[in-house]
């Protein structure tokens, strides 16, 4: 199989499907399925077979015509692409309702990816405490100092949109290179920093639109 690392030119739609592919091949290996094909993959994850083959072609020869794909090989391949074996520490900014839920979220496919620090304003009674599994919740005034002393390069933002950019600016100065952003605002960051935004309101509105279209 060709050894091929993803480049910055990898289509975003393809990149978003990588975790699906990894999760599927991981599950198939656990079910003792040794080989599969694009049609069966399509049925499992709801992506058409042509798209799957096109995605896979971006990485070289992942399978053989008439033979299909070896599940263990592709589990390991996509796992490596996604950094499954790397220890990833994350800072959570904002411990409101959503933030508290995220603190207790189990990253099922990546047990080496975990939140190790959380932050909020001094008015939050949780500041100065820690979760049951030992995650400290700091005052946001300590954010830059603490992150600089840590190995954290990734942050989750669960703050009000009017505060989000200021928090991001502070974290970029502290060395953060990637953000998962739940604030409904477009963040300005340097070219070497990655932002993945999730707008829950927009996602729900899109869902309702498609539900309405189904009823017509």
UniProtKB/Swiss-Prot annotation:
UniProt GO cellular component terms: cytoplasm
Subcellular location(s) per record: Cytoplasm
Residues in the DNA-binding region annotation: 20-59
Single biological process term from Gene Ontology: response to redox state
Annotated Pfam families: CoA_binding (PF02629), Put_DNA-bind_N (PF06971)
SUBUNIT field: Homodimer.
Protein name: Redox-sensing transcriptional repressor Rex
Native species: Lactococcus lactis subsp. cremoris (strain MG1363)
């Amino acid at each position: 199989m060709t050894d091929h690392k993803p480049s910055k030119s990898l289509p975003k739609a393809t990149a978003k499907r990588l975790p699906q592919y990894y999760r599927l091949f991981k599950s198939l290996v656990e079910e003792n399925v040794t080989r599969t094909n694009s049609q069966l993959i399509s049925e499992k994850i709801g992506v058409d077979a042509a798209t799957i083959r096109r995605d896979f072609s971006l990485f070289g020869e992942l399978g053989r015509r008439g033979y299909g794909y070896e599940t263990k090989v592709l589990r390991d391949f996509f796992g490596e692409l996604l950094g499954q074996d790397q220890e990833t520490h994350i800072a959570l900014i904002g411990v409101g309702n959503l933030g508290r839920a995220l603190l207790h979220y189990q990253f099922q496919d990546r047990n080496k990816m975990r939140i190790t620090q959380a932050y909020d304003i001094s008015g939050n009674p949780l500041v100065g405490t820690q979760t049951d599994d030992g995650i400290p919740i700091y005052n946001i005034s300590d954010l830059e100092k603490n992150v600089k002393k840590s190995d954290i390069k990734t942050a989750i933002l669960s703050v009000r949109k009017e505060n989000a950019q200021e928090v991001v600016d502070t974290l970029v100065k502290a060395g953060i290179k990637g953000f998962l952003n739940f604030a409904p605002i477009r963040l300005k960051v340097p070219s070497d920093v990655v932002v993945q935004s999730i707008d829950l309101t927009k996602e729900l509105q899109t869902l309702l639109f498609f539900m309405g279209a189904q009823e017509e």
